[in-house]
């Protein structure tokens, strides 16, 4: 009986390993439609998040091809495009951003990995500053607790960057709409409010602040609420 149980556990473990390997080497396109009378005209957005320096094909050729087929009006990046480990670098993320910036407007808000490399300079040196400088030079717009107004669409696009303590796994912090307002100010009246916020745990607070549509990431496999 014990041998059967061990064999079952082994088969189950191998199954999940195979699934993980397959999942880490593919991407899925999911489409969502949002309508609001405040929007002046249709807008197609592609969101990228949590690639952690992953390449799908040489220099992300498969991913870039899929994005071009979508023909977006702009691209939103919601953080963690590289991994904050000392032996890691940002080349794959840089090359992808460079290629996309040639054809599209790109708006980028940091994830916790970008924040870590920016704040812990003793460990990472100028990695973040070099990365951001290169991307800004490509025309990519970084939004760190600031916003831009997209006049053609009547959209106010905000990039929220919260303190890293809000990413703690076992001691969840309370954020609150008031704290979001301290970061971003009062939302612009009359426009449609889009927010790039890497951490999805605080959707209720983002909505209470005034966000109409939030682009998040961080949890990779999705968020489950019981």
Model feature map: region roles:
Residues 1-39:
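N-terminal membrane-anchoring alpha-helices
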Residues 29-31, 45-48, 144, 157:
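Hydrophobic residues on conserved beta-strands that form the core of alpha/beta folds
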Residues 34-39, 66-68, 158:
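Short beta-strand-to-loop junctions in surface cap/lid or active-site-entrance loops
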Residues 38, 53, 114-213, 219:
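Conserved catalytic scaffold of divalent metal-dependent phosphoesterases
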Residues 41-141:
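Membrane-embedded segments
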Residues 58, 223-226:
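Alpha-helical membrane-targeting segments
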Residues 85, 203-204, 223:
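Short, solvent-exposed loop/turn segments at secondary-structure junctions
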